[in-house]
């Protein structure tokens, strides 16, 4: 699991801080990330988490720390996997972009061109772009039981029959769960092998660059998944919302494919995947996933000027499945993109800096993921300043 770090041993410092179970490695000059990351545990902002950074195609920070669960008897280590809620959407967006790159999918094409059954009850003119940029008019879907979320065919049948709550394309409203089934079914339909979205991601993305990301976790990996901790948010959630969150700690949920919300991974893998969208990584010549033109198209703003997202009631700039972060993280230059998830996980890339960052954790918080976030804000602020001054290699 540490082979990538060992490749850079000549310029990487190994870290062992047993008081907070902090382990990992970082390149020379990046030690400040270790120090700030450690403060998350000293100040009890984190229970267990991992953080990783790629710069110029190489892994420069790879750290894990804290505890696997609230019993604090097992370390959170480099074998730990974590459910990341909506950060999962970014991998679905990458899968769709790969299909566009291969000529299998066109963002401007009607969904019915690939999925004829979708064209009913006012959805006939929905485009692929409408689905990927949260404009399809299906931000939510009534289900009689969460068990229905576990059955792909059931969810697709329901979505095919559903009537949109606005004219597709005319407005934007975050599709918290439905995005994954809609986009995932498109990928399955155009894939010559008809793989599920989880299979496609594993075989075309994560296996290719030797990382771990699962939508549909193999049962044998369940013991590696750190349970999410909701102590900090229980008082601000109603009973039904809290039930949804706890549902994501169940093994049956981990093993299903809920692409918008149940991706399971670690920070190292996320940072590597996003780095590989911009360049080859880890000295592997064939590791770049997207051509520059496809990446640019996928990360071009598809939100109208001054548009308010119907779901969030605030502006929410998005491209083709990616959140756009130029306003949230201005220190990393234009065209920064990625996705965050409920509770605090995040991955993003900054093409102007050839930089990618990922953070995942088990202790959930609703603090906004901006430069003022207490867990990652100081790390990102300092990193951005030092990159601007060319003080980091």
Give the ranges of each region predicted by the language model.
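A structural signal for well-ordered alpha-helical segments within the folded catalytic domains
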Residues: 31, 90-94, 109, 126-129, ...
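Active-site-proximal loop and beta-strand segments within enzyme catalytic domains
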Residues: 70-177, 185, 189
């Amino acid at each position: 699991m540490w082979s990538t770090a060992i490749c850079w041993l000549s310029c990487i410092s190994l870290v062992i801080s047993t008081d907070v179970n902090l382990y990992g490695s970082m390149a020379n000059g990046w030690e400040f990330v270790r120090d700030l990351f450690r403060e998350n545990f000293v100040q009890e902002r984190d229970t267990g988490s991992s953080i990783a950074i790629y710069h110029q195609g190489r892994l420069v920070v790879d750290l894990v720390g804290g505890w696997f669960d609230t019993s604090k008897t097992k370390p959170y280590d480099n074998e730990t996997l974590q459910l990341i809620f909506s950060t999962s959407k970014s991998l679905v967006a990458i899968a769709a972009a790969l299909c566009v790159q291969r000529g299998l999918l066109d963002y401007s094409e009607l969904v019915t061109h690939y999925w004829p059954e979708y064209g009913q009850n006012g959805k006939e003119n929905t485009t692929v772009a409408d689905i990927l940029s949260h404009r399809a008019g299906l931000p939510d879907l009534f289900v009689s039981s969460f068990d229905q979320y576990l059955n792909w065919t059931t969810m697709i049948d329901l979505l095919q029959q559903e009537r949109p709550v606005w004219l597709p394309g005319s407005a934007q409203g975050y599709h918290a769960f439905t995005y994954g089934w809609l986009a995932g079914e498109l990928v399955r339909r155009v894939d010559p092998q008809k793989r599920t979205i989880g299979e496609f991601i594993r075989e075309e993305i994560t296996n290719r660059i030797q990382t771990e990301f699962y939508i549909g976790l193999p049962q044998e990996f369940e013991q590696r998944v750190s349970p999410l901790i909701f102590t900090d948010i229980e008082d601000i959630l109603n009973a039904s919302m809290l039930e949804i969150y706890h549902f994501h700690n169940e093994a049956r949920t981990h093993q299903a494919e809920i692409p918008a919300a149940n991706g399971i991974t670690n920070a190292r893998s996320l940072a590597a995947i996003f780095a590989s969208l911009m360049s080859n990584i880890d000295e592997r010549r064939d590791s770049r996933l997207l051509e520059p033109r496809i990446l640019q198209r996928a990360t071009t703003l598809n939100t109208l000027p001054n548009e308010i997202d119907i779901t969030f009631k605030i502006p929410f700039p998005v491209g083709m499945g990616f959140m756009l972060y130029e306003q949230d993280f201005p220190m990393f230059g234009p065209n920064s993109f990625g996705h965050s998830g409920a509770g605090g996980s995040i991955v993003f890339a900054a093409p102007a800096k050839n930089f990618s960052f990922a953070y995942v954790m088990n202790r959930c918080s609703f603090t906004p993921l901006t430069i003022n976030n207490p867990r990652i804000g100081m790390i990102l602020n300092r990193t951005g300043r030092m990159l601007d001054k060319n003080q980091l290699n």
